[in-house]
Amino acid sequence: MTIDFRTETTFGYTTGACAVSGAYSALYFLKNNKKLDFVEILNLKNETLIIPIQNIERSENTAFATVKKFSGKDIDITNNMTINVEVTLQKLDNNSNLKLIEIFGGNGVGIVTKRGLQIDVGDYAINPKPREMIEKNLISLLNDGEKAVVRISIPNGDEISKKTLNPKLGIIGGISILGTTGIVRPMSNDAYKESLLPQIDIAIQNGFENLVFVPGNIGTKYAKSVLNIEEDQIIEVSNFWGFMLEKAGEKGVKDITVFGHAGKIVKLAGGIFDTHSKVSDARNEILCAYTSTLCNNQELMKKILQSNTTEEIIEILAEKDILNEVFNLISKRVVERLCLRFPNIKFSCIIVDINGKILGKCFLGDRFD
């Protein structure tokens, strides 16, 4: 398969593919004294990617190439980001017949500070597959006895990274160079799901036996303060509860507390394990069903079903003085659902409102003091 990104508008290419393209064009310039407007690189599946080069310059034995990140129709925070690659060509000892490639990060590329990732602590966040792709494509340009030193940098990478998961993963100072195939596929959750998994690895490496699964940043904020736990113990799952819980089980996790805002967590009580509103939204119906077990009031049921937000329903239940009873029931049902689907894991559930106040809870796993 060949994808020509000079004309392609649906697919995009990864930060890893940007780094490979920049490195190849820079080394090609050093070897052939010719600037390339585009490069043809191979990914690890031997698929050809044709990627445009924005700019290229040289100074003696060093060349500098610039590639602009393109995400296709799967627009993300790194779309149109500039990636700079510097390549220096060096001679080895006269008797050497080796071909060497060294890869480093520069400004705007993150540095790993936590165990559990694919990269050693203290190293630049350039994942193994992009490193392998760089080596695969550059090695053919080298003669025996030559070494290419590759350094990748990203203007504003530090600022961009603050809008990604990198700070939570312990990757500081910039973004990561990622990608297994070099191709960004549109409207696919697969890459995003995979990006969430290192959180579990880091928690396991740090020896945490009870993990706290939350929907996102708000859940993380209140879980830290309410439960008095470390951030590395908290796993943000976004909407992918089924996927993340399944992977946690595969990795040997035995005790999980589900913690989060009522609007997300009540869906789990209904057996909904992808909580994105485009996939499913039965919050009002679930809350109505559990309220009906405590109160036979048709007008109340209508109010709940017609409410615009979960917070509005919380206010209605508080006025009727059944708020905690309803959410304790829902918490219990969440635990029952999870235990049924993932029988090798002990579950607990804590549901909070928009301000982090506990509405309901059910403990089967280890308690938090």
From Swiss-Prot:
One of its GO terms (molecular function) is cobalt-precorrin-5B C1-methyltransferase activity. It holds the Pfam family CbiD. Keywords: Cobalamin biosynthesis, Methyltransferase, S-adenosyl-L-methionine, Transferase. GO terms for biological process: anaerobic cobalamin biosynthetic process; methylation. Its EC number is 2.1.1.195. Belongs to the CbiD family. InterPro entries: CbiD (IPR002748), CbiD_sf (IPR036074). It catalyses: Co-precorrin-5B + S-adenosyl-L-methionine = Co-precorrin-6A + S-adenosyl-L-homocysteine. NCBIfam families: cbiD (TIGR00312). This is Cobalt-precorrin-5B C(1)-methyltransferase. It comes from the Archaea. Pathway: Cofactor biosynthesis; adenosylcobalamin biosynthesis; cob(II)yrinate a,c-diamide from sirohydrochlorin (anaerobic route): step 6/10. Gene3D superfamilies: CbiD-like (3.30.2110.10).
